[in-house]
């Protein structure tokens, strides 16, 4: 099964593009983040005699060829998130120089032609011939060889996030034009590359006396990311600003061509990021005008002994949504890791110790989940040789990081509580209230899940699964009884439930609350989920691990998916934050030739399959599915519901773009058609194909 992440902004924009343009245009958009799987939805079936397997079938990939062939293995895909990951790789190298104490200035320049330049005043990439490959400069080795760099032996860098040979070489492979300048030992050098291949030798440009460091200028390859792909100035700006918060010893200067800012809101052409109080400055700005449980933000920074690294944190408790933004060596760890585990355990133990000190026995019931409820956390660690899960470094796996964080925060947290007894008691009572609410909810729930089902009187159209546990359970939301019938036959009855919807769900972005409350379709959906809405959402009451929107692969299906996503975003956003909401990817076409069958999700995929898979003799038959209900149960199972073969797109929310996402949802789904039309004109490449 393939699970690709898609932020909610991209999902809605992509779906709206399908609705508001002519149906025969292809799936391409500047903001669309549909990830094309490496294989068709259903791989073509061949007769055994059609295939050969011998020595000539084995291919050895050389140099950076694996990166171009499977970019998803290195940057997580070819969508907008992956595109901006290229910038992260380059600025991470510059930040490593700053953290190591060799640089204090980074310049970032975004041109209107989609060239991005990052310059630092560090030591500069070495340029002398490499001892292991004597006929090449070290710069060329770093740029063209995976797993080469100065961060493996721990001598050049005590802590680092990027690895020159993994990060910058991958960016080089995925750029159609890249130029690297190195100012080192009073000499200026330059080398050019294209798609990972040197286009020139190492050139010595002359003497420089007032400059040192590395300048990297690159242009993403349209063959990888698409013709209309462009950097988002707002995303680049926010990434750069966050790096400055993470290390208060660096100044980052931002420059952007005005032509590149035409669609960006409130992003200046020039800016300077420098924050002497680091994460505390960041959190104070984020929580401006918010009511906090304690008057002060708990923040600090600890340098560990024996060169093991450092920890910086800023923590506040408030009455809003909880989120944790953590980093390791300036790398954002979106999926958490061992450093977050250390933080959670330390805060729990500290509060329990304080409760014992003041004789509050009620605190015995609190857990780390109670402590972290409605907590806003910024956590940054710098450690030697960090171990991450996956190439994109979304989760920290270093075991020692937990101990480092615990040792760093334990004493400061104890002192913070002891020095402000009034605030500490207020916080403790607040956490105890969260724990008591949790226990009351548990007592109110029926022990047996099936009893709870009967008690709730779940919708009659719901075909529930047989297992009692939510772990591994899936709810498919489908449109209409016809599709529901096929899905019920195709499902695994043990863990897959089907909920057919009657017609299009209400657009909650434009409907009054009274109308939403009277909608039977919405009431059925809320009952089936079992987790409540808005502030009453309870993760532990959610009856399924995955909520999968499965609609037709046409315009109407996209519209229904947009309405459902809007409902989840406005009414149950925590369900999206927890990673429970997915989009199924059903096929639009069935292609057959002789004994070979394949399924295509859209027109461009169909054309690709016709060129690559159906090149033999014989009549090619192409059938277009009008809807899921037209598919046989075995076809639906094979292409869309079988975990081993299907593709799912996970919907996500970027915490730091929450306000922008709210505005986008309102513009696309709200009551003002002129705002929707304006948004499409400004943000979509399909404006010329509008069919209104």
Curated annotation (Swiss-Prot):
Mg(2+) 1 binds at residues 479, 552. Mg(2+) 2 binds at residues 552, 554. InterPro entries: DNA_gyrase_B_C, HATPase_C_sf, Ribosomal_Su5_D2-typ_SF, Ribsml_uS5_D2-typ_fold_subgr, Topo_IIA, Topo_IIA-like_dom_sf, Topo_IIA_B, Topo_IIA_B_C. Binds two Mg(2+) per subunit. The magnesium ions form salt bridges with both the protein and the DNA. Can also accept other divalent metal cations, such as Mn(2+) or Ca(2+). ATP binds at residues 53, 93, 120, 162-168, 393. One of its GO terms (cellular component) is chromosome. Keywords: Antibiotic resistance, ATP-binding, DNA-binding, Isomerase, Magnesium, Metal-binding, Nucleotide-binding, Topoisomerase. Its EC number is 5.6.2.2. Its cofactor is Mg(2+); Mn(2+); Ca(2+). The record marks 504, 507, 559, 676 as: Interaction with DNA. Residues 473-587 form the Toprim domain. It catalyses: ATP-dependent breakage, passage and rejoining of double-stranded DNA. It comes from the Bacteria. GO terms for biological process: chromosome segregation; DNA topological change; response to antibiotic. Transmembrane segments: none annotated. CDD domains: HATPase_GyrB-like, TopoII_Trans_DNA_gyrase. Changing residue 214 to I: In coumermycin A1 mutant. GO terms for molecular function: ATP binding; DNA binding; DNA topoisomerase type II (double strand cut, ATP-hydrolyzing) activity; metal ion binding. It is an enzyme of class 5 (isomerase). Pfam families: DNA_gyraseB (PF00204), DNA_gyraseB_C (PF00986), HATPase_c (PF02518), Toprim (PF01751). Topoisomerase IV is essential for chromosome segregation. It relaxes supercoiled DNA. Performs the decatenation events required during the replication of a circular DNA molecule. Heterotetramer composed of ParC and ParE. Belongs to the type II topoisomerase family. ParE type 1 subfamily. This is DNA topoisomerase 4 subunit B. It comes from Bartonella bacilliformis (strain ATCC 35685 / KC583 / Herrer 020/F12,63). The lineage of its organism: Bacteria, Pseudomonadati, Pseudomonadota, Alphaproteobacteria, Hyphomicrobiales.
């Amino acid at each position: 099964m393939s699970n690709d992440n898609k932020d909610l902004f991209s999902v809605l924009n992509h779906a709206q593009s399908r609705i508001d343009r002519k149906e025969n245009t292809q799936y391409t958009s500047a903001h669309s983040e549909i990830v094309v799987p490496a294989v068709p939805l259903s791989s073509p079936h061949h007769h055994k005699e059609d295939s050969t397997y011998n020595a000539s079938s084995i291919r050895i990939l050389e140099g950076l060829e694996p990166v171009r062939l499977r970019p998803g293995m290195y940057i997580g895909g070819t969508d907008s998130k992956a595109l901006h990951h290229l910038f992260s790789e380059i600025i991470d190298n510059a930040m490593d120089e700053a953290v190591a104490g060799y640089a204090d200035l980074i310049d970032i320049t975004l041109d209107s032609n989609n060239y991005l330049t990052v310059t630092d005043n560090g030591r500069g990439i070495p340029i002398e011939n490499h001892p292991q490959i004597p006929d090449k400069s070290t710069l060329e080795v770093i740029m063209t060889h995976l797993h080469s760099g100065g961060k493996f032996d721990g001598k050049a860098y005590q802590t680092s996030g990027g690895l020159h040979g993994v990060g910058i070489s991958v960016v080089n492979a995925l750029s159609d034009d890249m130029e690297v300048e190195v100012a080192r030992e009073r000499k200026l050098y330059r080398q050019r590359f294209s798609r990972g291949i040197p286009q020139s030798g190492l050139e010595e440009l002359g003497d420089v006396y007032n400059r040192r460091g590395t300048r990297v200028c690159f242009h993403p390859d349209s063959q990888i990311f698409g013709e209309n792909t462009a950097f988002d100035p707002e995303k680049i700006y926010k990434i750069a600003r966050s790096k400055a918060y993470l290390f208060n010893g660096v100044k980052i200067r931002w420059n952007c061509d005005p032509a590149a800012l035409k669609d960006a809101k409130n992003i200046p052409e020039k800016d300077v990021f420098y924050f002497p109080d680091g994460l505390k400055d960041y959190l104070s700005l984020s929580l401006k005008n918010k009511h906090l449980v304690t008057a002060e933000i708990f923040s600090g920074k600890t340098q560990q002994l024996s060169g093991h690294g450092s920890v910086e944190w800023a923590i506040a408790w408030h009455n809003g949504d909880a989120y944790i933004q953590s980093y390791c060596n300036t790398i954002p760890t979106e999926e958490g890791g061992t450093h977050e585990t250390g933080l959670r355990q330390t805060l729990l133990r500290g509060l329990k110790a304080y409760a014992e000190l003041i004789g509050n026995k009620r605190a015995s019931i609190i857990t780390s989940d109670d402590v972290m409820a409605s907590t806003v956390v910024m956590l940054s660690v710098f450690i030697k040789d960090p171990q991450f899960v996956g190439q994109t470094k979304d989760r920290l796996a270093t075991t020692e990081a937990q101990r480092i964080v615990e040792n760093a925060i334990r004493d400061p947290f104890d002192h913070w509580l002891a020095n402000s007894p009034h605030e500490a008691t207020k916080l403790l009572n607040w956490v105890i209230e969260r724990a008591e609410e949790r226990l009351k909810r548990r007592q109110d729930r029926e022990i047996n899940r099936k009893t709870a089902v009967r008690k709730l009187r779940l919708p009659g159209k719901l075909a529930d699964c047989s297992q009692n546990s939510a772990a591994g359970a899936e709810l498919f939301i489908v449109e209409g009884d016809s599709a529901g019938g096929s899905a019920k036959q195709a499902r695994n009855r043990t863990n897959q439930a089907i909920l057919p919807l009657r017609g299009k769900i209400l657009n909650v972005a434009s409907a009054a609350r009274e109308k939403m409350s009277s909608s039977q379709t919405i009431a059925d959906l809320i009952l089936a989920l079992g987790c409540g809405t808005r502030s009453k959402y309870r993760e532990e009451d959610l009856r399924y691990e995955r909520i999968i929107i499965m609609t037709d692969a046409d315009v109407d299906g996209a519209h229904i998916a947009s309405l459902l996503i809007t409902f989840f975003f406005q009414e149950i956003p925590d369900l999206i934050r927890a990673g429970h909401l997915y989009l199924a990817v059903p096929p639009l076409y069935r292609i057959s030739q002789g004994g070979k069958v394949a399924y295509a999700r859209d027109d461009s995929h169909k054309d690709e399959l016709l060129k690559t898979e159906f090149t033999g003799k014989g009549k090619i038959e192409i059938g277009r599915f009008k809807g899921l209900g037209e598919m046989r149960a075995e076809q639906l199972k094979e292409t869309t519901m079988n975990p081993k073969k299907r593709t799912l797109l996970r919907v996500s929310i970027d915490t730091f773009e929450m306000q922008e996402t709210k505005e986008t949802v309102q513009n696309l789904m709200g009551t003002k058609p002129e705002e929707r039309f304006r948004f499409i004109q400004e943000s979509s490449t399909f404006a010329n194909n509008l069919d209104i």
